[in-house]
């Protein structure tokens, strides 16, 4: 028996996304200074993520059933990120310190979900082995655990950097030359192939911002924490919102063909 209609599901998803916003938006009760450009970037990106969440959840009702999961995951990515960004903003305003713990908690949830998107869009058009899912997940966790351990001081920053890079390169191999990349090239229709390719380049070029920030911020100390946070924030816009827009575009395109 179907418990919820499509309209009811859409309403519930949007309500859940918006309900958390007032609670976390005023968590610290601090005023935002007009010259605090890092704090301003946290706020702008927080609201952009909330708006993206509402958009992705609404659009799930526009696409075919096989694409709904992908679009819902895109909305979950931006929702989780929005909540964490409000708290990261509070940490920055209250202490002036980099919110490393909140940022990595966000990444530990959202980055694996982004990687799962590769698996989901391939599953929508072909029979896909679960090996793709697990390889992308494992590569993501290796990358993030290495990065966090290095930034938080649990291991040597160089060792953390190397471990993180190994995880990233493992992901790149899978989506370019591994089973996922081959499946996209051989079985995907042109619209899916194009989306998959764009997503790959976001993971290649967009994600390169993070190890560069790590290198200049923690290994050489040549970048200020203010610059590092702004760079990370802008990178998250590209790597979360743009990623979801690509999924939305191919989902709508393929649904309209059906």
Please place each PLM-identified region on the residue numbering.
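N-terminal secretory/membrane targeting signals
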Residues: 1-27
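Residues at the start of alpha-helices and the adjacent loop-to-helix junctions
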Residues: 4-8, 19, 104, 203, ...
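Polytopic alpha-helical membrane-helix bundles and their juxtamembrane interface segments
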Residues: 26-103, 116-258
């Amino acid at each position: 028996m179907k418990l919820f209609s499509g309209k009811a599901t859409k309403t519930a998803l949007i309500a859940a996304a918006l309900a958390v916003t007032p609670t976390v938006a005023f968590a610290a009760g601090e005023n935002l200074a007009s010259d605090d450009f890092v704090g301003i970037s946290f706020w702008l990106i927080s609201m952009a993520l909330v708006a993206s969440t509402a958009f992705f959840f609404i659009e799930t009702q526009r696409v075919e059933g096989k694409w709904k999961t992908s679009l819902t995951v895109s909305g979950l990515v931006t929702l989780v990120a929005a909540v964490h960004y409000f708290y990261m903003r509070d940490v920055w305003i209250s202490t002036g310190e980099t919110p490393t713990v909140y940022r990595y908690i966000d990444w530990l949830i959202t980055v694996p979900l982004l990687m799962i998107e590769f698996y989901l869009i391939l599953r929508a058009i072909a029979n896909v082995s679960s090996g793709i899912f697990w390889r992308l997940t494992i590569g993501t966790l290796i990358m993030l655990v290495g990065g966090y351990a290095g930034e938080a001081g649990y291991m040597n920053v160089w060792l953390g950097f190397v471990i993180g890079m190994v995880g990233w390169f493992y992901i790149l191999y899978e989506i370019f030359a591994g089973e996922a990349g081959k499946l996209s090239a051989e079985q995907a229709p042109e619209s899916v192939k194009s989306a998959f390719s764009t997503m790959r380049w976001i993971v290649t070029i967009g994600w390169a911002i993070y190890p560069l920030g790590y290198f200049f911020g923690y290994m050489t100390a040549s970048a200020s924490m203010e610059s590092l946070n702004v760079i990370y924030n802008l990178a998250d816009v590209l790597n979360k919102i743009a990623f979801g827009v690509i999924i939305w575009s191919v989902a709508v395109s393929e649904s309209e063909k059906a």
